[in-house]
């Protein structure tokens, strides 16, 4: 079942990132799967707020800080 997404809840909004501020860095808590309960940082495009549920295709990768120019 490698094509299934894993739900994750947004617990904190860290800030805007990217060259023009187009992405938002958030901390999410993985709700299911082998990484259940783990909190990771992810970059999100589009509107997002605390409490939203994101469907992640991959839970092993963490977001790095994108440069702002």
From Swiss-Prot:
GO terms for biological process: maturation of SSU-rRNA; ribosomal small subunit assembly; translation. GO terms for cellular component: cytosolic small ribosomal subunit. The keyword Protein biosynthesis does not apply. Belongs to the eukaryotic ribosomal protein eS28 family. The gene is rps28e. PANTHER family: 40S RIBOSOMAL PROTEIN S28, SMALL RIBOSOMAL SUBUNIT PROTEIN ES28. The keyword Nuclease does not apply. Pfam families: Ribosomal_S28e (PF01200). One of its GO terms (molecular function) is structural constituent of ribosome. This is Small ribosomal subunit protein eS28. Keywords: Ribonucleoprotein, Ribosomal protein.
């Amino acid at each position: 079942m490698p094509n299934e997404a894993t739900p994750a809840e947004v617990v904190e909004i860290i800030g805007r990132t990217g060259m023009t501020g187009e992405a938002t860095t958030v901390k999410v808590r993985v709700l299911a799967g082998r990484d259940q309960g783990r909190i990771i940082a992810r970059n999100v495009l589009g509107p997002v707020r605390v409490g939203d549920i994101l469907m992640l295709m991959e839970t092993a990768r963490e977001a790095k800080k994108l440069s702002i120019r």
